[in-house]
Amino acid sequence: MKLLLALAGLLAPLAMLQTSNGATPALLGEVENSVVLSCMEEAKQLVDRAYKERRESIKRSLQSGSASPTELLFYFKQPVAGTRTAVRAADYLHVALDLLKRKLQPLWPRPFNVTDVLTPAQLNLLSVSSGCAYQDVRVTCPPNDKYRTITGHCNNRRSPTLGASNRAFVRWLPAEYEDGVSMPFGWTPGVNRNGFKVPLARQVSNAIVRFPNDQLTKDQERALMFMQWGQFLDHDITLTPEPATRFSFFTGLNCETSCLQQPPCFPLKIPPNDPRIKNQKDCIPFFRSCPACTRNNITIRNQINALTSFVDASGVYGSEDPLARKLRNLTNQLGLLAINTRFQDNGRALMPFDSLHDDPCLLTNRSARIPCFLAGDMRSSEMPELTSMHTLFVREHNRLATQLKRLNPRWNGEKLYQEARKIVGAMVQIITYRDYLPLVLGPAAMKKYLPQYRSYNDSVDPRIANVFTNAFRYGHTLIQPFMFRLNNQYRPTGPNPRVPLSKVFFASWRVVLEGGIDPILRGLMATPAKLNRQNQIVVDEIRERLFEQVMRIGLDLPALNMQRSRDHGLPGYNAWRRFCGLPQPSTVGELGTVLKNLELARKLMAQYGTPNNIDIWMGGVSEPLEPNGRVGQLLACLIGTQFRKLRDGDRFWWENPGVFSKQQRQALASISLPRIICDNTGITTVSKNNIFMSNTYPRDFVSCNTLPKLNLTSWKET
């Protein structure tokens, strides 16, 4: 039987068919192709209208100076260029499927998957008409490629899109959505998960994460630079863009001002007796991550990674070709990255300013008129500490390109740029795997998950796993509530040596007008990180006061992490323990044994009812730390597994024979982050040994003169 639908409604009623046992049939009927295409056309109109309303809304807010922090954040997480094209296609597809389901729903009161009424040919028709199909066009790779592509394409010659930008995350376990397709758990009131009520994310944050700031424990064996490298690294490998609209596709509802729940709005509801937010009808705004076009099952929602997955310094160089070109100085043949033409930092380069038509960084200090910086990752102006890291590596690229030009006067600008880029990429890999990851995982987990490098393996999948984007947020447990700035004697400097984090977001002016990056880098080296303890998980500066200074309501980062895991359809705590081959607790006592903390186990069970439902971030950061590591068993497995895949599945990994010569590899082995700081700043005394561990001046510090420089002799062409 054919079921003919018209966009205005049903042409004829359909008798409800049931199988003999009362179950929903696998196939409801067949929809006319014209109806499928009509829904797609309507979807395109709805999506385009919502995108346009968003652009006009934020433009008005920025021009009037009334932009909220969520609007500022949107500027840094909005899909742009190729990402925007990919996201728009996925939005067309998902809205069209939703429209089809809405029109079928009156015919079938039971839950069903819309794909049950579509033929494979019609699913392909949706993929083509949305634009999703065109993201899988065949990539032709050059026969000889000495350098990475900017986009990550062709790293794997057998499967050229693996690890490339603007592709879906890989799922290590199947998605778990409330409806089996796209709706997150917690969306529909009264719908249980594994037989238990889904707790409000804000309620879990209040009950388990909250602690008084004056009880904060400083980490005696980790510098704040340990936290900062984690963020810089994360921004090299993952960016999950938020929707290009803040308005409901179907009703035009503004997600920022309304607490109603309509896609893409998934606001955090406020529990009773909240310590800060007294109006229970209020909410914390939240927007679902952009969907991705997926090749195999086009209906089960996945998310998109806007960046290359490889550890390749894409935060310096970009993950799309137009941005990469924009970041370069193409006025000469010197292979340089572009620098700021208006300001310097004590005679040293700053990054260029972005050319945003309406710049959100201008709003953080209206009299200073300092725009956002332009970098390989759009979040570089999010906080001055992050800006300092980006600036450091732009300077290092230009230093290397200049030295390589002296060694090889005949090299043209392209060759100089690519060779310097290749060295910087290797530096980020070495610092990450030699210095940073062992301090995250601890020696036992490091040996288990990241054994000695053997060789490149083209059967290893280097894509970022969806779960990793949540697991790597363990770094929020390391954050101190202040930005610290120190002078050359490592003493607090300037009128504001200790600025609350809530006052530094998007404040590019603090780098330009308040002393540059040197005091910030000293602060990162000589200040301890926060230690994650089971009763001191995340500071209130980012749990209660995130962006509160210009917003109707402060954001709660831990609660946002939990809501995000539900948005992404991530399985719960025990599913990931099983994935990692770890015991899966089922009772309070068993959970108490795993956590080595019965009181915490009781708190978690009071919220979730079962360990199966504990949000992956909450469960992960609750575990006792691995010996000499800063994560527990589960996060060590997930983080270690991801970074092994990023290493072994990278054809351009710095140790892979043929990437660098043996002599070049020997030279690169001596590089260090302290030496890079010495070479590109006015700092003359830096951390000795591992920069991520040393944190006490003068005990842990040495003169720059004692650190070996990178010898570029083996880059000289004969």
Curated annotation (Swiss-Prot):
Subcellular compartments: Lysosome
Q: Which residue positions does UniProt flag as site: Transition state stabilizer?
A: 379
Q: Please provide, in alphabetical order, the Gene Ontology terms of the cellular component aspect for this entry.
A: azurophil granule; extracellular space; mitochondrion; nucleoplasm; secretory granule
Q: How is the cofactor bound?
A: Binds 1 Ca(2+) ion per monomer.
Name the cofactor(s).
Ca(2+); heme b
Q: Which UniProt keywords apply?
A: Calcium, Disulfide bond, Glycoprotein, Heme, Hydrogen peroxide, Iron, Lysosome, Metal-binding, Oxidation, Oxidoreductase, Peroxidase, Signal
Stored Pfam families: An_peroxidase (PF03098)
Cite the SUPFAM superfamilies for this sequence.
Heme-dependent peroxidases
InterPro entries, A to Z? Haem_peroxidase_animal (IPR019791), Haem_peroxidase_sf (IPR010255), Haem_peroxidase_sf_animal (IPR037120)
Q: Where does heme b bind?
A: 234, 382-383, 476
Q: Where is the signal peptide?
A: 1-15
Highest taxon of source: Eukaryota
Residues the record marks as carrying a glycan: 113, 297, 329, 365, 457, 711
Q: Which residues form the propeptide?
A: 16-138
Active-site residue list: 235
Q: Where along the chain is Ca(2+) bound?
A: 236, 308, 310, 312, 314
Q: Any idea of its EC number?
A: 1.11.2.2
- Reactions performed catalytically: chloride + H2O2 + H(+) = hypochlorous acid + H2O
Please give the positions of the paired cysteines in each disulfide bond: 141-154, 255-265, 259-283, 361-372, 580-637, 678-704
Where, per the database record, does this protein carry Cysteine sulfenic acid (-SOH)?
Answer: 290
Q: Which PROSITE patterns match?
A: PEROXIDASE_1, PEROXIDASE_3
GO BP of this protein? defense response to fungus; hydrogen peroxide catabolic process; hypochlorous acid biosynthetic process; low-density lipoprotein particle remodeling; removal of superoxide radicals; respiratory burst involved in defense response; response to food; response to gold nanoparticle
Its biological purpose: Part of the host defense system of polymorphonuclear leukocytes. It is responsible for microbicidal activity against a wide range of organisms. In the stimulated PMN, MPO catalyzes the production of hypohalous acids, primarily hypochlorous acid in physiologic situations, and other toxic intermediates that greatly enhance PMN microbicidal activity. Mediates the proteolytic cleavage of alpha-1-microglobulin to form t-alpha-1-microglobulin, which potently inhibits oxidation of low density lipoprotein particles and limits vascular damage.
- Family per similarity comment: Belongs to the peroxidase family. XPO subfamily.
Binding partners and assembly: Homodimer; disulfide-linked. Each monomer consists of a light and a heavy chain. Found in a complex with CP and LTF; interacts directly with CP, which protects CP antioxidant properties by MPO.
This one is known as: Myeloperoxidase
The source organism is: Mus musculus
Q: What taxonomic ancestry is recorded? A: Eukaryota, Metazoa, Chordata, Craniata, Vertebrata
